[in-house]
Amino acid sequence: MEIIKLDHITKQYDDGFVALKDINLELESGKFYSLLGPSGSGKTTILRIIAGFTEASAGKVYFDGQDITNLDASKRHINTVFQNYALFPHLNVYENVAFALKLRQRPESEIREKVKDALHTVRLDGYANREIFELSGGQQQRVAIARAIINEPKVLLLDECLSALDKRLRKEMQFELRAIQKKLGITFIFVTHDQEEALAMSDEIFVLNDGEIKQSGSPVDIYDEPVNDFVARFIGDSNILSGRMIRDFAVEFAGKDFECADAGITPGEKVEVVLRPEDLDITTPAAGKLLVTVQSQLFLGDHFEIKAIGQDGFEWLIHSTNGVQIGQEVGIFFDPEDIHVMRLGETEEEFDARLETYEGED
């Protein structure tokens, strides 16, 4: 069931800067969504328009089928967890979580029960009397989430709320947030510039740049089938080469012809070819589809990150569990399904239509 709809939303500031350009999106109830993009892409502006903190210059915002474009933020069934958590330092954990219910003058017995339930949901049982300064960053974040969910919102907005945590704690909180969302069954909308966070937690990702949605889809679809150069580079590491479509399921790049899994592109058309570093296997020169010379190698714990130069001068990035020697000539092998062909200037709608056409012929 649709819970949030943005209909042709545009945001232009007084200085002429256009933060959002004709944004259309529909979000279903009970799912975890991520708005992913670099700084200035418009993701936080979308969040603020949904929350009611920022007015759109044009377009409509719908909540549960009702037009809330001009509805005050305090009257929306939407709560927000901010980047800095916005906890009250002079109040303890219980008082922070209970704050909204006390403002509404709810009975003390109800407040105690709801605070207890909220703290249990975020795994902070026994922390009610702790002072905020006594908590770790991850614990403070969970207090902020408990405070946000105590009003039982239908939608929870999270604005870059993992960015202040160290790497280990960020990874832990990814599991925590996903578990909390599944337990509550409400819609989470998570803003981040970190593609790993978005891939790990989301049911669906919206990739933004320059005020536009460049692609939307499941984490697997976004990663495996980027529609353009920006998405391919922003979502994970990529080798992106210039190529030419030979015919359906055949493409030329790096001076050779290869089988691929793409079709529906005009023969002879210039394209871009994406190969992910983890899809490249290092083998002997005789067994490889291409020959490369190793330039550098970094050991990153679970794999080696290898940079190598192809015979055409292209610099390849390869992820391998096996190390190699600097200066060594090796072969790289990949399957047709590892090759992703991108049409120059193709929109997401055009890509989806092309995909349906040639998949329907199978």
UniProtKB/Swiss-Prot annotation:
Its EC number is 7.6.2.11. GO terms for cellular component: ATP-binding cassette (ABC) transporter complex. This is Spermidine/putrescine import ATP-binding protein PotA. Residues 4-235 form the ABC transporter domain. It catalyses: ATP + H2O + polyamine-[polyamine-binding protein]Side 1 = ADP + phosphate + polyamineSide 2 + [polyamine-binding protein]Side 1. It is found in: Cell membrane. Keywords: ATP-binding, Cell membrane, Membrane, Nucleotide-binding, Translocase, Transport. Belongs to the ABC transporter superfamily. Spermidine/putrescine importer (TC 3.A.1.11.1) family. PANTHER family: SPERMIDINE/PUTRESCINE IMPORT ATP-BINDING PROTEIN POTA, SPERMIDINE_PUTRESCINE IMPORT ATP-BINDING PROTEIN POTA. The keyword Transport applies. ATP binds at G37, P38, S39, G40, S41, G42, K43, T44.
